[in-house]
């Protein structure tokens, strides 16, 4: 692994310390976030992407909520 001194030395080599301070690392994280988003959209694992799974799960949750709401409504009608 890396020692603390090696990490510190690598971080000191990033330009813009006086002008931007700690914010000089933002472009790296911006690019990293964009790459991660691209992977989640484009890369398929099996037949699905991350967003396919997300949409399916959201749809399933919405369906379950509707079932619960209708069963509660029917229960209230039976009680009255």
Swiss-Prot record:
Belongs to the UQCC5 family. Pfam families: UPF0640 (PF15114). GO terms for molecular function: mitochondrial ribosome binding. The keyword Transmembrane helix applies. PANTHER family: SMALL INTEGRAL MEMBRANE PROTEIN 4, UBIQUINOL-CYTOCHROME-C REDUCTASE COMPLEX ASSEMBLY FACTOR 5. InterPro entries: UQCC5. GO terms for biological process: mitochondrial cytochrome c oxidase assembly; mitochondrial respiratory chain complex III assembly. It is a single-pass membrane protein. GO terms for cellular component: mitochondrial inner membrane; mitochondrion. Required for the assembly and stability of the mitochondrial ubiquinol-cytochrome c reductase complex (complex III (CIII) or cytochrome b-c1 complex), a multisubunit transmembrane complex that is part of the mitochondrial electron transport chain (ETC) which drives oxidative phosphorylation. Mediates early complex III biogenesis. Participates in regulating the levels of electron transport chain proteins, and therefore energy supply, in response to changes in energy demand. Also required for cytochrome c oxidase complex (complex IV) assembly. It is found in: Mitochondrion inner membrane. Associates with the mitochondrial ribosome. Interacts with UQCC6. Interacts with MT-CYB; interacts with newly synthesizes MT-CYB. Forms a complex, named COMB/coordinator of mitochondrial CYTB biogenesis, composed of UQCC1, UQCC2, UQCC4, UQCC5 and UQCC6; stabilizes nascent cytochrome b/MT-CYB and promotes its membrane insertion. The chain crosses the membrane at residues 20-41. Keywords: Membrane, Mitochondrion, Mitochondrion inner membrane, Transmembrane, Transmembrane helix. It comes from the Eukaryota. This is Ubiquinol-cytochrome c reductase complex assembly factor 5. The gene is Uqcc5. Its main location: mitochondrion. It comes from Mus musculus. Residues 42-80 are mitochondrial intermembrane. Residues 1-19 are mitochondrial matrix.
């Amino acid at each position: 692994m890396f020692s603390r001194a090696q990490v510190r030395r690598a971080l000191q080599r990033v330009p813009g310390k006086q002008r931007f301070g700690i914010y000089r690392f933002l472009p790296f994280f911006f690019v990293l976030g964009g790459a991660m988003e691209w992977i989640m959209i484009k890369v398929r694992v099996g037949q699905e992407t991350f967003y396919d799974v997300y949409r399916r799960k959201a749809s399933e949750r919405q369906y379950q909520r509707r079932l619960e709401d209708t069963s509660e409504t029917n229960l209230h009608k039976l009680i009255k």
